[in-house]
């Protein structure tokens, strides 16, 4: 992630996002995890809810709502929509990207390439097998699944920030050492002080 971020922070950001979200497979029923990850190119994105109306029924769930800041959504195949049910339990809905509307509201100066659009659905029927409790009912025993999700996000995003800082310092040093003046001499080797 550090090396990728040194070339393109937006790409690294999206990779980190999908990698962390993929660890949710450890909380899914096996059939849902298989449905998503049998495709080796599966990419997941999510975002915090702006609004939602989720009606859980016996065999399926009727979903309407809008979620934002979904980094990498143009490349994603599955969207993780977070909601709180009537019992105040946080749950995740796995929605195929083909069912949502993308809304390009990502007007920023930095990390524009993450394409962190919002997405919305209106009265979409989702099978109940696509819904699972958020961070409950861990089904895998590997140590990575015991690390809190927010810590995984934080360590990835801080790696990106450190890589950007390192790349910026290296660029400034290289620029200072190797910039050439009007007469093709390195400015660092000239005897007079120049200011631009």
Task: Please tell me what each predicted stretch does.
Residues 61, 79, 115-119:
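Short beta-strand micro-motifs in enzyme catalytic cores
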Residues 51-52, 90, 116:
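Short, acidic/polar N-cap/turn motifs at the starts of alpha helices
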Residues 109-196:
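Glycine-rich beta->alpha junctions and the first turn(s) of the following alpha-helix
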Residues 66-103:
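A short core secondary-structure module
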Residues 55-57, 96, 122:
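A structural detector for beta-sheet-dominated domains
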Residues 1-76:
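Glycine-rich flavin
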Residues 45-48, 97-108, 113:
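Active-site glycine-rich loop that binds ribose-phosphate moieties when present
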């Amino acid at each position: 992630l550090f090396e990728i971020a040194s070339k393109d922070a937006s790409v690294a950001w999206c990779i980190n996002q999908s990698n962390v979200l993929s660890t949710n497979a450890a909380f899914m029923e096996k059939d849902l995890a298989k449905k998503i990850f049998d495709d080796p190119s599966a990419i997941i994105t999510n975002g915090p809810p702006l609004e939602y109306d989720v009606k859980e029924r016996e065999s399926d769930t009727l979903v309407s709502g809008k979620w934002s800041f979904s980094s990498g959504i143009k490349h994603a195949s599955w969207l993780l929509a977070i909601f709180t049910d009537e019992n105040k339990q946080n749950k995740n809905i796995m929605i195929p990207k083909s069912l949502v509307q993308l809304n390009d509201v990502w007007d920023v100066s930095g990390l524009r390439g993450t394409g962190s659009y919002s997405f919305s659905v209106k009265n979409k029927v989702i099978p109940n097998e696509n819904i699972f409790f958020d961070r409950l009912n861990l089904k895998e025993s590997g140590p990575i699944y015991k690390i809190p999700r927010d810590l995984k996000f934080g360590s990835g995003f801080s790696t990106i920030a450190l890589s950007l800082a390192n790349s910026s310092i290296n660029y400034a040093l290289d620029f200072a050492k190797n910039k050439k003046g009007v007469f093709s001499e390195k400015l660092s080797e000239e005897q007079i002080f120049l200011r631009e």
